[in-house]
């Protein structure tokens, strides 16, 4: 019987996409998980560890965000197939690795500043604060998925195509992207309340 070395096995996401991609934003490097996995499903093993979700593959975090609200709640296989088809569409439209396009979209749509409420003497003040890198990734993923769901709601366009278009638009820093518009809105409000 042959023995296999772990380093010789070439794992790719969905059996197609390599996870060796470049992250340009140094603050997000620790929080975008790019370890190679064939099936992005960890079963919530990160849940009880602090910053455990930072080690989760970024594709699984996208799948979990697609699965989260409303009628897709708990249907991970449906969310898995949505993301898999969206990645195929991204590869066809851009000719690039969809994981690289996703990482670029996250970097572009992650807000750097936001507003928090501070109550002082019974008066509420809104103060601009820097956003933690973990929250930046969370907000970027949430806004990408919200934009895709908004684009496909009451529309014949399927969610897979809407998600692919949203990721491509955010990766190219296109203001038509919901995630980019949301980021600019958050940063504009923070700028006005400095």
From Swiss-Prot:
This is Small ribosomal subunit protein uS7. Keywords: Ribonucleoprotein, Ribosomal protein, RNA-binding, rRNA-binding. GO terms for biological process: translation. Part of the 30S ribosomal subunit. One of the primary rRNA binding proteins, it binds directly to 16S rRNA where it nucleates assembly of the head domain of the 30S subunit. Is located at the subunit interface close to the decoding center. SUPFAM superfamilies: Ribosomal protein S7 (SSF47973). GO terms for cellular component: small ribosomal subunit. Pfam families: Ribosomal_S7. Belongs to the universal ribosomal protein uS7 family. It comes from Sulfurisphaera tokodaii (strain DSM 16993 / JCM 10545 / NBRC 100140 / 7) (Sulfolobus tokodaii). The keyword Ubl conjugation does not apply. PANTHER family: RIBOSOMAL PROTEIN S7. GO terms for molecular function: rRNA binding; structural constituent of ribosome.
């Amino acid at each position: 019987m042959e023995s296999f070395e772990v380093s010789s096995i070439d794992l790719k996401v969905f059996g197609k996409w390599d996870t060796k991609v470049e992250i340009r934003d140094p603050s997000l490097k620790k929080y975008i998980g790019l370890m190679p996995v064939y099936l992005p499903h960890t079963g919530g093993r990160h849940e009880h560890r602090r910053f455990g979700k930072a080690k989760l593959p970024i594709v699984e975090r996208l799948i979990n965000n697609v699965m989260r609200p409303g009628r897709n709640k708990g249907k991970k296989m449906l969310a898995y197939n949505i993301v898999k088809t969206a990645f195929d569409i991204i590869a066809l439209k851009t000719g690039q690795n969809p994981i690289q396009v996703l990482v670029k979209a996250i970097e572009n749509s992650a807000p750097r500043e936001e507003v928090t409420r501070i109550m002082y003497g019974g008066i509420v003040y809104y103060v601009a604060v820097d956003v933690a890198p973990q929250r930046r990734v969370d907000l970027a993923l949430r806004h990408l998925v919200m934009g895709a769901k908004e684009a496909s709601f009451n529309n014949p366009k399927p969610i897979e195509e809407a998600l692919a278009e949203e990721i491509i638009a955010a990766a190219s820093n296109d203001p038509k992207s919901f995630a980019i518009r949301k980021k600019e809105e958050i940063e504009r409000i923070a700028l006005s309340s400095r």
